Amino acid sequence: AAEKPLLLKSYHRLVDQVCAIYGGTIETEDNHDVLVTFDKPHEHMTHCVNALCAAQFFFGLYKAFNAQRAAHGKSNLSIQIVVHTGNLEELSSLTEKAAELSRRERQEHMVISRQVAYHPELQQRVLQANNCTPLASGAVSLARLSSDYQDLLDMQISHFSPDL
């Protein structure tokens, strides 16, 4: 229990690293939930591509960090990642939808909302059907991004993992 604040700080440092590379604004809630927004919509859904890459990069670092801690007999935390999209003027409802998906869909992989999973531009650029598992809620469990993106992310994860 005494270690939890230090663990949370370590995970937050990972979020900081990821957002320094992919952009995004970080907000930490009182309950330690972390919200990262990519608030500048760009042509070709680049902001969503950045959000997916950032989430997958964080997920890889998080898994590597947990594996390192487990190898030394140390505790770790289980984190759920949900990627959702919408108008930031409706941030409260977007956050609630993401939180609802997080509570409902406890998955080993990242969860992406229906709006992200079925967006034609994202399906064409970064999502491959064989990496996506439909969930009862209509959301999707995403194991990995398309190879062009995932291969780069895997290299980044390998590069940053030893220094965790």
Locations of regions flagged by a protein language model:
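Juxtacatalytic helix/coil linker segments
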Residues: 1-13, 17-22, 164
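Short helix/loop segment flanking the catalytic signature motif in cyclic-nucleotide metabolism enzymes
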Residues: 3-7, 29-76, 90-97
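N-terminal cationic-hydrophobic initiation segments that often serve targeting/anchoring roles
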Residues: 16, 59, 102-103
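A glycine-rich, hydrophobic loop/mini-helix early in the fold
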Residues: 21-25, 33
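Intrinsically disordered, glycine/charged-rich C-terminal tails and inter-domain linkers
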Residues: 24, 89, 97-164
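Short hydrophobic beta-strand segments that form the core of ligand-binding sensory/regulatory domains
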Residues: 35-37, 82, 111
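Extended hydrophobic secondary-structure segments that form protein cores and membrane-embedded regions
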Residues: 78-84
